[in-house]
Amino acid sequence: MSKKEILQAEKSIALVKEQFSKGLCNALNLYPISSPMIVNEGTGINDDLNGIERPVSFPVKFLNNNRGVVVHSLAKWKRIRLQELELDAHEGILTDMKALRPDEDSSPIHSIYVDQWDWELHIDKSDRTLSYLKNIVRKIYQNLLDTEQKVYEELGIEPILPKKLSFIHSEQLLQLYPTLTPKEREHTIAKDYGAVFIIGIGGKLSNGEPHDSRSADYDDWTTPTEEGYKGLNGDLLVWNPVHDKALELSSMGIRVDKEALEHQLTLAGALDKKSLLYHSLLLADKLPLCIGGGLGQSRICMFLLRKKHIGEVQASIWPEEVRKQAELEGINLL
């Protein structure tokens, strides 16, 4: 890869990131803020994701060797920050999150280095509805469409996203394709519609299994909705023609209130977490109601720029066999 090609690739990545982040702030009324890469261990602020990933942890000399942990994401930290900033309802924050997930599998769409636009929006109690969730998701999707159009104007890459985003609950998806695995269901529905938001991720479905696992203490995946299903969260998927597969771009949702937190901790067998800082603040009604999520920067870049490997849009470490295979296929890892 020539110097000129490298610089052009970096310029294209910067175009996507600048356009998308600016549009997201305008669409959701968000203030860009700084955020930590490291938090104190034992506070409950770092995210468990699906409950089993190990965080990067290390002793800190000036904290008497108490340990710090590199964040998985900032879902809980953002909620505390909303309270500290005393933002009004329908104001929020956007962070440029950098995280490490050492238990992540290596693949063309996975890296141990995670870069996300992590956002959180203060809401009213009356906003804790499926219709409000869908309204926010549509605004995010419109920003994705606008960014795709900008990429077309600047780089000539033809738009492929449908103008309208489809919604489906994970239980409806199970009923449509009862013999398929969750991932196979995602690929099938994304191929059919081009872009889809799957609602209700984390709670058990009629087959006794969740569509995918979710930590019990940030997204609300148990509250009944006006459509007769449970869950106020979901995943945004698009059909990626480069891999001929579905690609998840975002996981997001209305966050638990104290009732949903208590219920979900009970279901998860994790009531011991109630004594942690974040959980005790929430159970004492000291944190704002909110909606939030993460949008994968590298994934959005690789999708809009039609890249085959996430390493073409971010610098990370890879197994030697991955580097060799990339070289054989003419894939230029940064």
Question: Language-model features: where?
Answer:
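A translation/RNA-centric and nucleic-acid-associated enzymatic feature enriched
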Residues: K98-L100, Q172-L334
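Extended, charged alpha-beta segments that form solvent-exposed binding/catalytic grooves
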Residues: T95-T188
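A generic secondary-structure signal for well-formed alpha-helical elements
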Residues: L24-Y31, I140-V151, K308
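Short, Φ-rich (hydrophobic/aromatic) sequence segments
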Residues: R81-E86, V137, R299-I300, L304-L305
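Generic recognition of stable, solvent-exposed alpha-helical segments in well-folded globular domains
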Residues: K11-L15, Q19, R128-N135, K139, ...
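A glycine-rich phosphate-binding loop feature that marks nucleotide/adenosyl-phosphate handling sites
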Residues: M37-E41, G156-P162, I201, E321
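Class II aminoacyl-tRNA synthetase-like tRNA-binding/catalytic domains
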Residues: M1-H110, D118-H122
